Amino acid sequence: LVDPPADHPGAYMPPAGDLSVPQFPVPASSLDRVASLLKSARRPLIIAGPETGGLPSEPLLRLAERLGAPILADPLSGLRAGVPDGAPVLDAFDAWLRSVPPSPPDFVLRFGAAPTSKVLNQLLAGWSDAVHVLVDLPGGYREPNGTQPVVLAGSPAAAAGALAAVPAQAEAGWRGRWLAADRAARAALDAASREPCEVFEGRVFTELRDLLPPGATLVAGNSMPVRD
């Protein structure tokens, strides 16, 4: 690798403080409206969608524990790795939601952009009886499914922290059913990827997940730059 000249624009690396994500508090009026809806929720579901830089794991996990809600984590949410063992984070739902649809939620709380999962987007559009809440930065409205959500404008961490103070609790067994289905699907996928067979490219992801240390960064790309 060749370092660029010191006066080249690409040689500048901003200090860490310049890379911090701006924090926006949640408007009190919007929070009061969402809190009143959340108090009556008995089947809450949290969707962690794609987000530049990843979503804040600790505030979302605290919120999930407080509400008794499962978190469906998109691959681009940043929540599929680095979370404690036993955290209510689901990562295999794309493999089972279509064939084993769960009881529909009555409250859907989505952070970030729309999920990349086609089946999850279809279900979101079909859960018309549920209350949909979209947490997005001020001025944002990343909602392609036509659910007409209540928008809670603010930073994900601020919104999760504020909602964790709402006295709400899911019905018994609600989160457990989601977790059991997802754990079973994950175990089946892992077992299938390790079965003796001809070369299976997908196995590399299973092995990397087990081998990489927490917080590791994996850089992946295609071969075009090499060929070019």
Mark where each language-model region is.
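Active-site donor-nucleotide binding/catalytic segment of nucleotide-sugar enzymes
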Residues: L37-G53, D182, D190-V199
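Conformationally flexible catalytic loops at phosphate/diphosphate-handling active centers
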Residues: L1-K39
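Glycine-rich phosphate/diphosphate-binding loops that line cofactor/substrate pockets in enzymes
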Residues: L31-P44, L63, E207-P214
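Active-site regions of enzymes building and remodeling cell-envelope glycoconjugates
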Residues: M13-G17, V83-A95, A130, N145-A157
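Glycine-rich, anion-gripping cofactor-binding loops and their flanking helix/strand elements
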Residues: D32, A48-V133, Y141
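Structural motif
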Residues: R43-L45, F107, T217
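Phosphate/pyrophosphate-binding active-site segments
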Residues: L123-V226
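Thiamine diphosphate
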Residues: T116, V226-D228
